[in-house]
Amino acid sequence: MIDKKELREISLKKKREKRLTWEEIGKYLGRDKVYAAMLLYGYAQATEEEADKIITLLDLPKELKPAFLDAPMRTPAQPWPPTDPFIYRLYEGVLLYGPVIKDVAHELFGDGIMSMIDVKIYVDKVIENNYPRMVLTFNGKWLYYSKW
């Protein structure tokens, strides 16, 4: 059986060949475009139905299904420091604005953290003053620190 890394390479190649967008794949799966990307990148575990749909949509061999059903190994895929400019800017945003976001969040919610397990991530495009802008939303469950 192939691993998630090989599965990602095969899946992304097929996506490019078929000229599919993440939006199209997400709609086909009944999921958000970011979650669809997570499935093809191997960052999320597909359900039986999702695996079947991906295999059909991308014309993949049925033998790849078990790899989609495997639980992913969630280790950082990026070097530190990040070398990709886009990903570096995401890190930069957290490094620069993290203390401020944390302070505002604690004022709103109290002492805790936002779950990155129970989270939904959305990427959207808006036009503001005739310029495209990216809207990045992390919608995560708030987890309070325990008291004992």
From Swiss-Prot:
Which residues form each disulfide bond in the chain? none
Superkingdom, according to UniProt?
Archaea
InterPro entries according to UniProt? Cyanase (IPR008076), Cyanate_lyase_C (IPR003712), Cyanate_lyase_C_sf (IPR036581), Lambda_DNA-bd_dom_sf (IPR010982)
Enumerate the GO terms in the molecular function aspect. cyanate hydratase activity; DNA binding
| Single GO biological process annotation from the record | cyanate metabolic process
Chemical reaction(s) catalysed: cyanate + hydrogencarbonate + 3 H(+) = NH4(+) + 2 CO2
Keyword set, alphabetical order = Lyase
Keyword hit for Lyase: yes
Record-annotated active site: 89, 92, 115
Q: Which SUPFAM superfamilies match?
A: Cyanase C-terminal domain (SSF55234), lambda repressor-like DNA-binding domains (SSF47413)
Q: Does the record's keyword annotation contain NADP? A: no
Q: Write the Enzyme Commission number(s) for this entry.
A: 4.2.1.104
Q: What does this protein do?
A: Catalyzes the reaction of cyanate with bicarbonate to produce ammonia and carbon dioxide.
| UniProt record similarity statement | Belongs to the cyanase family.
PANTHER family attached here?
CYANATE HYDRATASE (PTHR34186:SF2)
Protein name according to UniProt: Cyanate hydratase
